């Protein structure tokens, strides 16, 4: 936190930054760290935002973030299907809790941006429809939806091109998996498919 404080002081003083976004998907892993960062940010009269995980902070910690000037968070939910979140994404994030915490965060006058991806290996059309329903039933301020991309060096790329994963021996790319490498094009084709249902 001391380094971050001097860094932000430099950004706001020398470079006249008037807002900060912490693009760190481990920003709120642990209440103590998040609360210390909130203490640091309360020393600056600027709005700030952070990428967070929905289930790693207590409700009191979200309140401390809001009180210190946090105006919004980005939550990577990935899917509205519990099976996809648990078995495919391997995130083990309770979607009912996500809905509860999104509502809580919004009650603190913070925005919540939810991110979702479609077209994962093993994900069914029904899973994608569940995701659309989950988004509709949750109080996100904004959302981001994208198609899964096979980025070289990732486990997904290895799964598709080597047809196995040594670290996840049960992983398979089933015959329904769309092998489109461009996430944007994949998303467009999935949207058309979902609109027909």
Sequence positions of predicted segments:
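Active-site groove signature of glycoside hydrolases
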Residues: 12-26
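A structural motif corresponding to the C-terminal lobe/cap of the Radical SAM core domain
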Residues: 6, 26, 30-31, 36-197
């Amino acid at each position: 936190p001391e380094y971050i404080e001097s860094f932000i002081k430099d950004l706001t003083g020398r470079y006249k930054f008037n807002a900060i976004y912490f693009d760190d998907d481990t920003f709120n892993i642990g209440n103590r760290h998040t609360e210390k960062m909130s203490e640091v940010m309360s020393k600056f009269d600027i709005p700030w935002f952070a990428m967070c995980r929905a289930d790693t902070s207590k409700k009191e910690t979200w309140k401390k973030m809001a009180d210190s000037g946090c105006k919004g968070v980005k939550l990577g939910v990935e899917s509205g299907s519990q099976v996809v979140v648990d078995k495919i994404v391997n995130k083990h994030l309770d979607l009912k809790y996500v809905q509860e915490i999104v509502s809580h965060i919004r009650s603190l006058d913070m925005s919540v941006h939810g991110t979702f991806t479609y077209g994962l290996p093993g994900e069914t059309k029904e899973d994608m429809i569940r995701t659309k329903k989950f988004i509709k039933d949750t109080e996100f301020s904004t959302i981001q939806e994208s198609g899964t991309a096979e980025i070289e060096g990732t486990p997904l790329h290895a799964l598709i091109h080597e047809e196995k994963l040594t670290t996840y021996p049960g992983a398979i790319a089933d015959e329904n998996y769309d092998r489109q490498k461009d996430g944007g094009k994949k998303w467009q084709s999935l949207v058309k498919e979902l609109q027909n249902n």
